[in-house]
């Protein structure tokens, strides 16, 4: 397992990408989370689309001085292309609400809920969204044996991109007593559901479509598989019976709306092989915008090219009063 670190950066890096345009967009990317590199790659395509759309664009690699830099730059809108801590967890939306700067993507509460796996799990179950059996394990519990019958999944509470996720199978040489809790003092342990990996893109409350992930090399949809070409195939649209496909879209819209999301989101599910039962995994309020990313791919299938997708996201920019 790789260990991806959060990096504390004092000063933001600011670059003017386009000095003229109809509105001034601050494209926020990079930042201090373990998903920094994913965010930077996502921002490359977004910046090109924003310039193509005729916006004045300033790129900001976010540091701890971000409030001061925003006061200096005075953008009309912030395009939140951050992933992980400080950008995806509700921190940046909170700051932008105070500064009264409109921003893309979800607000404080929906971002924080979706990012924290304990609280999102409680929210899902409260709203009758089916999930795999799961428990919270604290480092202080000093558990020596498997906390659940194998196979099971270990998930850090607040990491995206499957960073830190491990699947423990019956044959694995793994002793839970040796697990070092690399991403905080709590983890979620969930029953591993063998089945088909399904992803749904939602934009402004409407599900655009679903695709299936077919693993080619690794045993589960981990960080390496998500961001390495040739490790998985995307089947778009997902080859499902019409009634099941429709149910998937309806469930995704339900999650999006009950969590009061804004702009783009990606809902993730497992379809159990033996029972055809859907299990929700999570909703991601800051889906990737890379060449291999799922939301742009599904949007293209729905007739929305990448540039138009970015324009639709910009249209939702607002702050919470």
Curated annotation (Swiss-Prot):
Mg(2+) 1 binds at residues 268, 282. Pathway: Cell wall biogenesis; peptidoglycan biosynthesis. GO terms for cellular component: cytoplasm. Mg(2+) 2 binds at residues 282, 284. Its cofactor is Mg(2+); Mn(2+). Its main location: cytoplasm. Its EC number is 6.3.2.4. It is found in: Cytoplasm. Keywords: ATP-binding, Cell shape, Cell wall biogenesis/degradation, Cytoplasm, Ligase, Magnesium, Manganese, Metal-binding, Nucleotide-binding, Peptidoglycan synthesis. Residues 121-315 form the ATP-grasp domain. Binds 2 magnesium or manganese ions per subunit. Cell wall formation. This is D-alanine--D-alanine ligase. It comes from Rickettsia conorii (strain ATCC VR-613 / Malish 7).
């Amino acid at each position: 397992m790789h260990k991806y670190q959060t990096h504390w950066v004092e000063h933001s890096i600011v670059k003017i990408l386009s000095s003229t345009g109809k509105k001034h967009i601050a494209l926020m990317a990079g930042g201090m989370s373990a998903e920094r590199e994913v965010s930077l790659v996502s921002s490359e395509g977004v910046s090109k689309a924003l310039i193509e759309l005729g916006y004045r664009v300033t790129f900001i690699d976010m540091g701890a001085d971000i409030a001061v830099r925003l006061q200096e730059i005075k953008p009309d809108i912030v395009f939140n292309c951050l992933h992980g801590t400080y950008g995806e967890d509700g921190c940046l939306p909170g700051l932008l609400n105070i500064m009264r700067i409109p921003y893309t993507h979800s607000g404080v509460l929906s971002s924080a809920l979706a990012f924290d796996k304990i609280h999102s799990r409680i929210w899902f179950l409260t709203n009758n969204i089916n999930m795999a059996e799961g428990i919270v394990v604290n480092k202080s519990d000093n558990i020596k044996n498997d906390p659940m019958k194998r196979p099971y999944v270990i998930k850090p509470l607040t990491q995206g991109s499957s960073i830190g996720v491990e699947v423990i199978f019956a044959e694995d040489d793994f002793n839970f007593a040796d697990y070092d809790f690399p991403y905080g003092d709590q983890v979620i342990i969930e029953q591993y559901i063998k089945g088909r990996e399904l992803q749904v893109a939602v934009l402004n409350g409407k599900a655009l479509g679903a695709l299936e992930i077919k693993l080619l090399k690794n045993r589960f949809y981990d960080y390496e598989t998500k961001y390495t070409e040739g490790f998985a195939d995307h089947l778009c649209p997902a080859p499902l019976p019409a009634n099941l496909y429709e149910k998937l879209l309806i469930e995704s819209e339900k999650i999006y709306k009950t969590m009061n999301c804004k702009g783009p989101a990606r809902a993730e599910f497992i379809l159990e092989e033996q029972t055809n039962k859907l299990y929700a995994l999570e909703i991601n309020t800051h889906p990737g915008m890379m060449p291999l990313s799922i939301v742009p791919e599904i949007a293209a299938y729905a007739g929305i090219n990448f540039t138009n997708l970015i324009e639709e996201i910009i249209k939702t920019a607002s702050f919470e009063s």
